[in-house]
Every structure is written in structure tokens, then in C-alpha cells.
Amino acid sequence: MSFRSSSTSPRSNKQTATKRFKQSGQAQSVGSPKRHSVKRKNNEQSKKSLSLAERKIIIFNKPYDTLSQFTDGEGRKTLADFIPVKEVYAAGRLDRDSEGLMVLTNDGILQAKLTQPKSKSPKTYWVQVEGAPTEAQLEPLRRGVELKDGLTLPAQVEIIQDPQLWERNPPVRFRAAIPTTWLAITIIEGRNRQVRRMTAHIGFPTLRLVRYSMGGMTLQDLQPGEWKEISLPS
């Protein structure tokens, strides 16, 4: 990817390559059994009848301060401000104050594969934290940390060089006397604000969070607000 630099990580002596992070339970509705059965049958039929020609997969670089949904009653930026394609839905969410890769599709099977916990689909985030954690301080994340909603599964965590990202608008607020560090964190869960809570748990608050990859798909060279339609093998 070709990006403009916004800040420099003090851990530039770490030579870990970010390339290694290119990753090559259904809810039951409440109601009458008959209606549930018909709905389930229709959903299964629509999935089976979706051909490769009909399948749409879109990758999108979500800008900061954008909601990961198509509608909003409060006038905030949404996916509809950037993506004109109809009948595609986000596979998972990305916080309003986070940036990076979102996958949108009309393929229910792919959507489930990317989002359901049992699929254990990897998601990699580039995370700028306040401070300079040591390998020993990062080790709890690799083992799992106890958050309010339970113990996290082990994560892959590495210190990386500044990934040379685009400038964020608004800029990240830094404290001049405190260094920052970039981490690549890969998880196979999708709890609310999980990565931010994980880094805060070990004493290094997240300043900036960018999702780089999801289920083997990456940001490629997309700039904030850009999207493209891609195809995947059947």
C-alpha cells in the first residue's frame, strides 16, 4: 500500500514485517415454530441459489467518524455516503472511531463465515498505543486477558514499524513526553471494542486503530472512503 506518514513509531528498530499478517451459533428467533421454519427454509434456499455471478463482495476503507451501517437518524456519516451498491450488508462492524477494512456482501454464507465465533476467522488490526510496551508486557495478550465479559482467546501480537498510513482527520492527539508504539494484533473473536480494551488492560491505551485484514482479505491500496468489488474462489 502507498500511504502518507502521520507519525513515527519510536520502536522503528523492530523489523517485524507487517506482511506476515496477510492472513492466507446461529441466533434463534422467538415466534411460532411454523413461521420460524418457513423463514429458515427461505434463507437456506436463497443461499443455495446464489451463483458466483450473483455474489457481490466489496472491500471498503472506512474513514474515522463513520458509522458501519447504511442509515442513521442523527445525520452522521454512514456507509451510504460512500457505497452506492444495493443489497450488500456489512460482515461485522467497526467502531465509529476506528478505521480500515470492512467487507460487505450479499452472500449470507460468507457473511456468517467472517462473523460467527465458531468460524474463528482471523482479523488483524494495526494499533497505535500510548507508551512503549516490552515483549513481556505484551505476553498477557498472547495468553488471554480477563475482561469484564470474560477471558479473551490468545491473540497474535507483534511490535511493528510505523505502517505509513494516511493522515487521520482529525489528527491523533499525542502527549509530547510519551512515546507511541505500533502493534499488529490478530484476534479470532469479535467482542465490542475488544482490542481497545485489551491494550488498556495491560496499561497501554489505544490511540489509533486500523483494521488491516479480515478472513484473508486486506485493505490493499484503498484510501479512506474508497471501495472496490472483488471476487473470491468458490
Curated annotation (Swiss-Prot):
This is Ribosomal large subunit pseudouridine synthase E. The active site is at 95 (nucleophile). SUPFAM superfamilies: Pseudouridine synthase. GO terms for biological process: pseudouridine synthesis; rRNA processing. Belongs to the pseudouridine synthase RsuA family. Residues 1-49 are annotated as: Disordered. One of its GO terms (molecular function) is RNA binding. Responsible for synthesis of pseudouridine from uracil-2457 in 23S ribosomal RNA. Its EC number is 5.4.99.20. It comes from Vibrio vulnificus (strain CMCP6). The gene is rluE. The keyword rRNA processing applies.
